[in-house]
């Protein structure tokens, strides 16, 4: 029993009931009330979505250019063959990918056990049927197997373009998860006089490439690793960044007199408090035409001079006028 009412109970009893190499029930108790559902749901989601596994990602079949083909002498079409290949359970030791070869001819069943394997690759369901050959049938293919996590579609998976890749290689959607099924139940538990506690029971079934008990341990490590950051949570002070005004083109800081306009045009601009080229380019044609004594001819003169410098009327300038700019 805990020493204080403020301390949380931790599970002290863990039982593993193994039904087969691929299925087991793991029960843990006691948990404080509510923790059974909290942890059970988190572990279940991690087990289903975040466990590493192996899956075929690419298949190249001799004489086949696309998945909607058929092959003489083979009972199944290519789509069915690819679906059957996805059902093969691979396990790689010490490597993250491998290229496998399958060659067979003559009447009979082609199964996963017919694939040629290096010493560090296993097929856990060698009796899994890939296709059936007729008397004159033959099949030759290469299968690429990779390590990954969760489910990855071809469009969502970044496929490395290899110039040496065999023509006609077909990309496969890949389900890497080694977990076939997982569910959990929360049952009542009791410690001394307390009867409001939880018992968590996880029912896990895998494809055989990982032990159910090891799967729970891996999921727990992932959860701990993800949550550990919150244990050391510290606010990061936000530094106040002084906004710097964008640099101003030196041409804009020059007085309008430098444009060498006619005296009439220059005087009209100064009468409207337009002293710098930066002041001028922010005015529109309509605004300038409202200026007393400044007509269309003067406006065209101003536009031509500005255009020669790569400037136009109606421009917008940020932080204008700059600090410290005075009338000339």
UniProtKB/Swiss-Prot annotation:
<dbReference type="Pfam" id="PF01193">
    <property type="entry name" value="RNA_pol_L"/>
</dbReference>
<comment type="similarity">
    <text>Belongs to the RNA polymerase alpha chain family.</text>
</comment>
<dbReference type="GO" id="GO:0000428">
    <property type="term" value="C:DNA-directed RNA polymerase complex"/>
</dbReference>
<dbReference type="InterPro" id="IPR011773">
    <property type="entry name" value="DNA-dir_RpoA"/>
</dbReference>
<dbReference type="InterPro" id="IPR011260">
    <property type="entry name" value="RNAP_asu_C"/>
</dbReference>
<keyword id="KW-0804">Transcription</keyword>
<dbReference type="GO" id="GO:0005737">
    <property type="term" value="C:cytoplasm"/>
</dbReference>
<dbReference type="InterPro" id="IPR036643">
    <property type="entry name" value="RNApol_insert_sf"/>
</dbReference>
<protein>
    <recommendedName>
        <fullName>DNA-directed RNA polymerase subunit alpha</fullName>
        <ecNumber>2.7.7.6</ecNumber>
    </recommendedName>
</protein>
<comment type="function">
    <text>DNA-dependent RNA polymerase catalyzes the transcription of DNA into RNA using the four ribonucleoside triphosphates as substrates.</text>
</comment>
<dbReference type="InterPro" id="IPR011263">
    <property type="entry name" value="DNA-dir_RNA_pol_RpoA/D/Rpb3"/>
</dbReference>
<dbReference type="Pfam" id="PF03118">
    <property type="entry name" value="RNA_pol_A_CTD"/>
</dbReference>
<dbReference type="GO" id="GO:0006351">
    <property type="term" value="P:DNA-templated transcription"/>
</dbReference>
<feature type="region of interest" description="Alpha C-terminal domain (alpha-CTD)">
    <location>
        <begin position="248"/>
        <end position="328"/>
    </location>
</feature>
<dbReference type="GO" id="GO:0003677">
    <property type="term" value="F:DNA binding"/>
</dbReference>
<comment type="subunit">
    <text>Homodimer. The RNAP catalytic core consists of 2 alpha, 1 beta, 1 beta' and 1 omega subunit. When a sigma factor is associated with the core the holoenzyme is formed, which can initiate transcription.</text>
</comment>
<dbReference type="Pfam" id="PF01000">
    <property type="entry name" value="RNA_pol_A_bac"/>
</dbReference>
<dbReference type="GO" id="GO:0046983">
    <property type="term" value="F:protein dimerization activity"/>
</dbReference>
<feature type="region of interest" description="Alpha N-terminal domain (alpha-NTD)">
    <location>
        <begin position="1"/>
        <end position="234"/>
    </location>
</feature>
<keyword id="KW-0240">DNA-directed RNA polymerase</keyword>
<keyword id="KW-0548">Nucleotidyltransferase</keyword>
<keyword id="KW-0808">Transferase</keyword>
<dbReference type="InterPro" id="IPR036603">
    <property type="entry name" value="RBP11-like"/>
</dbReference>
<dbReference type="GO" id="GO:0003899">
    <property type="term" value="F:DNA-directed RNA polymerase activity"/>
</dbReference>
<dbReference type="InterPro" id="IPR011262">
    <property type="entry name" value="DNA-dir_RNA_pol_insert"/>
</dbReference>
């Amino acid at each position: 029993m805990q020493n204080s009412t403020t301390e949380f109970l931790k599970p002290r009893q863990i039982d593993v009931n193994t039904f087969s190499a691929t299925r087991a029930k793991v029960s843990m108790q006691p948990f404080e009330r509510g923790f059974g559902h909290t942890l059970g749901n988190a572990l279940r989601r991690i087990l289903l979505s975040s466990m590493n596994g192996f899956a075929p990602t690419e298949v190249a079949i001799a004489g086949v250019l696309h998945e909607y083909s058929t092959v003489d002498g083979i009972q199944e079409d290519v789509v069915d063959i690819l679906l059957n290949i996805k059902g093969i359970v691979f396990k790689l030791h010490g490597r993250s990918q491998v290229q496998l070869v399958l060659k067979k001819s003559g009447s009979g069943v082609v199964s996963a056990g017919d694939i040629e394997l290096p010493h560090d690759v296993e097929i856990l369901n060698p009796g899994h049927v890939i296709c059936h050959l007729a008397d004159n049938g033959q099949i030759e293919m290469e299968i690429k197997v990779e390590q990954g996590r969760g489910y990855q579609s071809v469009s969502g998976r970044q496929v490395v373009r290899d110039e040496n890749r065999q023509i006609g290689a077909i990309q496969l959607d890949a389900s890497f998860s080694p977990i076939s099924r997982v569910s959990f139940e929360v049952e009542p538990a009791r410690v001394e006089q307390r009867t409001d506690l939880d018992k968590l029971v996880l029912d896990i079934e895998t494809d055989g490439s990982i032990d159910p008990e090891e799967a729970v341990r891996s999921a727990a490590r992932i959860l701990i690793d993800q949550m550990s950051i919150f244990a050391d949570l510290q606010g990061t002070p936000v530094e106040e960044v002084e906004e710097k005004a964008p640099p101003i083109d030196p041409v804009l800081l020059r007085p309008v007199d430098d444009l060498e306009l006619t005296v009439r045009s220059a005087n009209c601009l100064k009468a409207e408090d337009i002293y710098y080229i930066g002041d001028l380019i922010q005015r529109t044609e309509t605004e300038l035409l409202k200026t007393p004594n400044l007509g269309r001819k003067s406006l065209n003169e101003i536009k031509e001079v500005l255009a020669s410098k790569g400037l136009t009327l109606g421009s917008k300038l940020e932080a204008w006028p700059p600090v410290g700019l005075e009338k000339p």
